[in-house]
């Protein structure tokens, strides 16, 4: 089971800090149900329109301001069910969603795949908690260009892959519009700098041509902080791709890079270090996330 909103449809899930809306499962285990899927009419780089990998609904178009509704003070728990033998749901999957949509104060908790994933679109977000999801806490691809503030991501359950996985397009890294989000004030916490288990234990993976302006990040308890791959991504200047003011705490390797052919390269030009508060309280739970979330 899952909830899907087709193009032209809208969802209104509006809780409060004391009474959040909760989408959950009686089983209380990751992958118990599919999660929430929104399909909008905003631009993507896969084609003018495409079929969503989960739900098989159409998404994409040329309406940057498309409105798929409002999700505020909402928890999505234990999502990530298998859709077919190749694809799993995320907690919240945003396919070509426009910036007329409001997504603020949302938690993605204990899913079996990613917490939240953006497939193109222009949607913006604020105050997002993504924790204990078993793959990536945050993920984007297919030309997403949203503006975002205050993300708090935390691995858990002895599983997890990356805090952020960022792509432009896996079949052609040069497709436009390029993924190019603005993201400020973020804390990403891993399972430990010496953790050995499932996943790559990376805070941020930037690859397949993505751009982005990331600012004020705290990366704590990871084997690797920032990893950048593929020639198109590595060809950007700091005006196109930059992690500005990043603080590394208990991170074994701050950064690494690899060309499309697999050769190691230095990527220090893509980030600058500085002490900052990340999502609000450094590694601690931010004040804005208290009272309506779980598992922190």
Residue ranges and their predicted role:
Residues 1-3:
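Classical protein tyrosine phosphatase
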Residues 5-8, 15, 24-113, 117-134, ...:
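Extracellular beta-rich repeat passengers
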Residues 19:
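A phosphate-binding glycine/aspartate-rich beta-alpha loop in the early core of alpha/beta enzymes
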């Amino acid at each position: 089971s899952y909830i899907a909103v087709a193009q032209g449809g809208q969802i209104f899930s509006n809780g409060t800090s004391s009474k959040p809306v909760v989408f959950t499962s009686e089983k209380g285990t990751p992958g118990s149900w599919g999660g929430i899927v929104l399909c909008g009419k905003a631009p993507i780089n896969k084609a003018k329109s495409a079929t969503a990998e989960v739900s098989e609904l159409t998404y994409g178009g040329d309406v940057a301001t498309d409105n798929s509704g409002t999700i505020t003070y909402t928890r999505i728990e234990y999502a990530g069910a298998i859709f077919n033998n190749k694809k799993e749901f995320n907690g919240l999957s945003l396919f070509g969603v426009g910036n007329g949509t409001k997504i603020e104060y949302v938690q993605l908790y204990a899913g079996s795949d990613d917490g939240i994933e953006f497939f193109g679109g222009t949607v913006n977000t604020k105050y997002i908690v993504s924790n204990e999801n078993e793959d990536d806490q945050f993920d984007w691809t297919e030309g997403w260009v949203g503006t975002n503030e205050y993300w708090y991501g935390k691995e858990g359950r002895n599983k997890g892959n990356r805090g952020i996985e960022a792509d432009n397009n896996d079949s052609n890294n040069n497709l436009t519009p390029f993924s190019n989000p603005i993201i400020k004030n973020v804390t990403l916490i891993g399972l430990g700098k010496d953790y050995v288990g499932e996943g790559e234990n990376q805070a941020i993976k930037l690859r397949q041509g993505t751009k982005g302006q990331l600012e004020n990040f705290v990366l704590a308890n990871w084997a690797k902080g920032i990893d950048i791959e593929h020639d198109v991504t590595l060809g950007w200047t700091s005006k196109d791709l930059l992690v500005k003011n990043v603080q590394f705490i208990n991170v074994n390797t701050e950064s690494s890079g690899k060309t499309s052919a697999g050769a190691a390269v230095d990527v220090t030009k893509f980030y600058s270090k500085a002490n900052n508060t990340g999502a609000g309280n450094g590694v601690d739970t931010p004040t804005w996330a208290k009272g309506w979330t779980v598992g922190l």
